[in-house]
């Protein structure tokens, strides 16, 4: 395999290459994806199972044209925590089902109305910073997960973090041949070894993981429904819809295709929400397309849905193989943080590419103001509370950008703008 060769979305991959490429994607999403069930105090096996099923459904519904891995959604954490505290986890599952169903209805509406409106509500001057914020607002998360800030900083965590990051960075630039397609996987392995040598990972933890029961059945649960619990979770639909559009835009920019048109936003949005609905029915957490895996594609230039599908199959297998799932859970924060540090930055850069590729003219006040306000809104920490749902970061910035874009569009229609 030639260095830096692009492996396209529909391209077949040899079995001997498919496995390590798929493992790389699974590891990239693992740290963030299992964090959600840990917060909800539930076994992550069911989440690994549904992540795999959801990803395969996504590939099937989008006709294999949109490479995306579905992991656990963070957007539901705040309202779901409230519901779990007051009603129990099964009622949160009911909320997940309803949000997923409403998202499927929204996808049908988009199918009937088209996507031309996106260029009006999110012109390039707004779209670029919104996409960039998907990665930039997670920068702090990468640092905290990597244990390089706060009270968790030790010599071992810093060394492990730096080894992981350094291998990922220099490997992406220097590796040739097949190794140029798996720098993230190699970085994770090197970081793990560094973690063992520095004491970040205790050898007893590894031994305990290897002695876990070989066959482990995920804990399936059924949802219960309460109108009050549903109303607390339902507003998250606004958040995940914006998040989904942003992810499709940045993925399209990475692979060089317009995914909003082919396979279409209606298909990808339906697939995303259908997976969330199924997750609620079997006891898992909601799913969403993952920025970490977009970052992996941006670095490796491997876009094949067969690789993504392989990662999904591996995730399903891991959910039933106790020692394998337990070993993956021993990957420490500094390793996940070191990888995320680079991946989130790559997503941010993809947003800036939108501005460059669309030749956004910043001599026009409208474009300058749009980009400026969106960036500041997303990075300032401003929060808008709507009942039990809080809008902040990229989501709030996207909404502000949409409103401003519509206002500026009206100014143009009535010839009120001073931009020539």
Label the predicted regions.
Residues 54-66, 104-118, 168-176, 245-256, ...:
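C-terminal ends of transmembrane helices
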Residues 21-54, 66-91:
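Transmembrane helix-boundary motif of multi-pass solute transporters/channels
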Residues 86-202, 312, 317-419:
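Membrane-embedded alpha-helical modules
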Residues 1-20, 203-219, 253-260, 268, ...:
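Intrinsically disordered, low-complexity non-transmembrane regions of multi-pass membrane transporters
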Residues 16-29, 154-165, 182-183, 198, ...:
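Hydrophobic, membrane-embedded alpha-helices of multi-pass small-molecule transporters
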Residues 2, 31-33, 164-171, 182, ...:
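Juxtamembrane interface elements at the cytosolic ends of transmembrane helices
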Residues 5-16, 38-59, 65, 235-305:
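Membrane-embedded helical hairpins/re-entrant loop segments and their flanking transmembrane helices
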Residues 79-88, 172, 293-308, 314-318:
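Interfacial segments of multi-pass membrane proteins
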């Amino acid at each position: 395999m030639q260095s830096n060769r692009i492996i396209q979305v529909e391209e077949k991959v040899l079995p001997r290459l498919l496995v390590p490429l798929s493992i790389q994607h699974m590891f990239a999403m693992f740290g963030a994806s299992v964090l959600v069930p840990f917060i909800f105090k539930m076994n992550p096996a069911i989440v690994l199972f549904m992540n795999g099923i959801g990803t395969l459904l996504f590939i099937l519904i989008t006709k294999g044209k949109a490479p995306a891995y579905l992991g656990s959604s963070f957007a539901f954490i705040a309202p779901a925590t409230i519901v779990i505290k007051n009603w129990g986890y099964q009622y949160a599952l009911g909320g997940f089902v309803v949000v997923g169903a409403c998202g499927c209805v929204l996808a049908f509406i988009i199918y009937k109305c088209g996507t031309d409106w996106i260029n009006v509500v999110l012109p390039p001057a707004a779209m670029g910073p919104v996409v960039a914020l998907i990665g930039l607002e997670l920068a702090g998360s990468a640092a905290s997960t990597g244990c390089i800030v706060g009270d968790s900083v030790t010599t071992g965590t810093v060394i492990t973090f730096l080894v992981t990051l350094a291998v990922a960075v220099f490997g992406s630039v220097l590796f040739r041949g097949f190794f140029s397609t798996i720098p993230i996987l190699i970085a994770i392995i090197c970081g793990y070894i560094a973690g063992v040598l520095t004491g970040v990972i205790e050898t007893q933890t590894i031994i305990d993981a290897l002695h876990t029961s070989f066959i482990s059945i995920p804990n399936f649960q059924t949802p219960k429904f309460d109108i009050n619990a549903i109303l607390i979770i339902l507003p998250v639909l606004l958040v995940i819809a914006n998040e989904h559009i942003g992810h499709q835009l940045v993925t399209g920019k990475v692979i060089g295709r317009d995914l909003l048109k082919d396979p279409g936003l209606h298909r990808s949005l339906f697939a995303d929400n259908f997976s969330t609905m199924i997750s609620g029915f079997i006891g898992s957490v909601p799913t969403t397309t993952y920025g970490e895996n977009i970052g992996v594609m941006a670095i490796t230039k491997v876009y094949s849905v067969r690789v993504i599908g392989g990662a999904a199959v591996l995730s399903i297998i891991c959910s039933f193989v106790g020692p394998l799932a337990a070993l993956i859970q021993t990957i420490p924060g500094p390793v996940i943080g070191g990888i995320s540090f680079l991946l989130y930055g790559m997503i941010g850069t993809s947003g800036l590419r939108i501005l460059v590729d669309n030749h956004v003219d910043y001599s026009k006040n409208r474009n300058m103001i749009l980009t400026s306000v969106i960036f500041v809104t997303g990075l300032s920490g401003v929060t808008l509370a709507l009942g039990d749902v809080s809008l902040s970061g990229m989501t709030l910035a996207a909404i502000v950008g949409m409103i401003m874009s519509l206002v500026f569009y009206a100014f143009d229609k009535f010839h009120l703008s001073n931009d020539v």
